[in-house]
A protein has these predicted regions:
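Conserved beta-strand elements of beta-rich interaction domains across eukaryotes
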Residues: 53-57, 158-160, 248, 305-309, ...
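Structured domain cores in non-transmembrane regions
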Residues: 29-32, 37-45, 53-165
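Cleavable N-terminal signal peptides of Sec/SRP-targeted secreted and luminal proteins
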Residues: 6-27
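A short, structured loop/turn motif at beta-sheet edges
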Residues: 143-149, 175, 291-294
Length: 333
């Protein structure tokens, strides 16, 4: 007859095995996305329109006006399934993402996508022309297959250390139905490979590289950062994408387009972002000057670091004076 101790040990072992099985049952893979399978019977044709909203009214702080002025790189888009990620917030940037975010070079990014296409995890790659201004439009047509219904894209901000906008694994299919229209507001991301704080910062590699992070009005929490707006709860969208499904007959299929839309299309309007004045610390007090009979006066100054814009807080006084006793008078006392 087995002792109660042996029975207890056996029961604990069985419980442990059950718990381990449950863990493996519910712990799915980390990178692949769950619930993204598309069961549509045929591909869908879309037109993708990228719109830049990067204006001195919405983003007045350190707005790039020349060498080079604010502009957008070419757009790189990839259709894929759940086993591929072009980029992902909270993870390190690949070599291709780094080179594109820092330099606008697409060679390694496209090479990785082509290799993934051989493994049938990437469907197709698309691109649009760059936009020479902060405000503008570009577009391309896409033919999305059910087996690769996710869309990821990137556009580099020029100039910037390693900043970009984009979407990660946007699903254009829901069950067996293609979505008719999708609009997404875009915000800046930091690739984590360059430590520059401003649009025109010199090259300053981050060592070791950090994860891709979203830039907000409060992060990075440093006054020197070009997107630091402490009065704002969140930044206005700096760009957006609109994806519209197109009807397409089997007999006539127009060629894929890759063009900049005319400027006659009205850009989306956002309220102007207030930019408060920023001043330096006070200098040291100057010499106390004046006759001993009336007492002396000393001065100190500060200077403007950032001029206000869009009804931001005006600059305070830049010079201050106070009464004092001249040093020569103290010697006679």
């Amino acid at each position: 007859m087995m002792s109660s101790e042996h029975l207890t040990c056996g029961w604990l072992q069985q419980l442990l095995l059950v718990l381990v099985k449950l863990c493996f049952t519910f712990a799915g893979p980390l990178r692949p996305l769950i619930g993204t399978e598309c069961t549509a019977k045929s591909p869908a044709s879309y037109i993708l329109v990228f719109t830049g909203h990067w204006s001195p009214q919405a983003f007045p702080k350190q707005y790039p006006l020349f060498r080079p002025p604010a502009q957008w790189s070419k757009l790189i888009a990839v259709s894929h399934n759940r086993h591929f990620r072009l980029w992902e917030e909270g993870t390190p940037a690949s070599a291709g993402v780094q080179h594109f975010a820092e330099l606008g070079v697409t060679v390694e990014l496209m090479k990785a996508a082509k290799e993934a296409r051989k493994k049938r995890v990437v469907g197709a790659m698309y691109r649009t022309a760059g936009i020479p201004n902060g405000i503008g439009h570009s577009s391309t047509e896409m033919l999305i297959q059910p087996r690769s219904s996710l869309l990821s894209l990137m556009v580099k901000m020029i100039p910037s250390p390693d900043w970009f906008v984009g979407v990660d694994s946007l699903n254009l299919c829901e069950g067996n139905q293609w979505k008719q229209e999708v609009t997404v507001d875009l915000h800046p991301y930091d690739a984590g490979t360059d430590s520059g704080f401003t649009f025109s910062s010199p090259n300053f590699p981050t060592s070791p590289p950090e994860n891709i992070t979203k830039i907000t009005s409060q992060f990075p929490n440093h006054p020197a950062n070009s997107f630091y707006y402490p009065r704002l709860k969140e930044l206005p969208p700096i760009a957006s994408i609109r994806i519209m499904r197109q009807s397409r007959s089997r007999d006539h299929q127009s060629p894929m387009s890759n063009h900049i839309l005319p400027n006659s299309i009205s850009p989306q309007r956002f309220s102007a972002t207030p930019l408060d004045c920023e001043v330096s610390l006070w200098s040291s007090w100057g010499l106390c000057l004046g006759p001993c009979s009336r007492g002396g006066v000393r001065h100190r100054t500060r200077y403007i670091l950032l001029r206000p814009a869009n009804a931001g807080t005006p600059c305070p006084e830049l010079e201050e004076q106070s009464e004092c006793v001249p040093h020569s008078c103290m010697q006679h006392q």
